[in-house]
Regions:
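Substrate-recognition element of Asp-dependent hydrolases with the DxDx(T/V) motif
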Residues: 69-117
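Asp-based, Mg2+/Mn2+-dependent phosphohydrolase catalytic module
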Residues: 1-2, 115-197
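Generic structural signal for small/hydrophobic residues in well-ordered secondary structure
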Residues: 8-11, 47, 92, 102, ...
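Alpha-helical elements of Rossmann-like donor-binding domains used by nucleotide-donor carbohydrate transfer enzymes
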Residues: 20-23, 39, 53, 57, ...
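Active-site neighborhood of HAD-like aspartate-dependent phosphohydrolases
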Residues: 1-37, 46, 60-64, 176, ...
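Metal-dependent phosphoesterase signature
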Residues: 44-87
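Generic enzyme active-site microenvironment
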Residues: 6, 103, 163-164
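Short, solvent-exposed loop/turn segments at secondary-structure junctions
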Residues: 12-13, 18-20, 106-110, 137-139, ...
Length: 197
């Protein structure tokens, strides 16, 4: 029986901007440094490099961009956080016995932006029994290690957990460990419909 729900953050609660992907590709994917950029991004999301090191890396690839321009492009993926999703989460916390866990690939810049721009961030965070951000725990999906970390840290069995994420690679890793999954499609699904599935 499922007693724990593990949620992703982006495209589950906060919307991510499709236009960001186009902008990112336009500015970065065409670069000869693309593989190095992806490595830098992963290091940043795992908390292995500082904000300053991250920005300096990007400036070495794109010297025409200022640090503020890089920050702006980096944060432009973050969109609206509809309050009805917070209401759903609050109701779930108050009226169910599920253990609620957040497991997000993120970074210092994104979390800083969210804290500054999402007025109810503290309320959101308080809904969870555990709140795991990749740059803080030094682990990142889809690595199997991050799922084992969550299971072991909370004395959970895979079969008792439901993991909700919009990224197929992350779902595959969770499936590999026999964690129940919902591969949420942000274009057609909404987390508030969890119990309608």
């Amino acid at each position: 029986m499922i007693n724990t729900i593990i949620f992703d953050f982006g495209n589950i609660f906060i919307n991510l901007n499709d236009t960001y992907t186009l902008d990112y590709i336009k500015h970065f994917e065409s670069s000869e440094h693309y593989k190095s950029i992806i490595k830098t991004n992963i290091q940043f999301e795992k908390g292995e490099i500082s904000i300053d090191s991250f920005l300096k890396s990007y400036q070495s690839y794109f010297p025409d961009l200022s640090k503020e321009e890089i920050k702006s492009k980096w944060n432009s993926i973050l969109g609206e956080f509809p309050k009805y999703r917070l209401d759903f989460l609050k109701d779930l916390k108050e009226n169910s016995n599920y253990k609620l866990i957040l497991l997000s690939n993120t970074n210092e810049l994104h979390i800083s932006w969210i804290k500054d721009n999402i007025a109810f961030y503290k309320d959101f965070k308080s809904c969870f029994n555990e709140f795991y951000l990749s740059h803080e725990i030094k682990l990142r999906k889809p690595d199997v290690d991050v799922f084992n970390f969550v299971l072991n840290k909370n004395n959970l069995t895979a079969e008792a957990c439901l993991f909700i994420d919009d990224n197929k690679d992350n779902i595959i890793s969770a499936d590999y460990l026999n964690i129940n999954t919902w591969h949420l499609n942000p274009k057609t699904d909404d987390v508030i419909d969890l119990f309608k599935n």
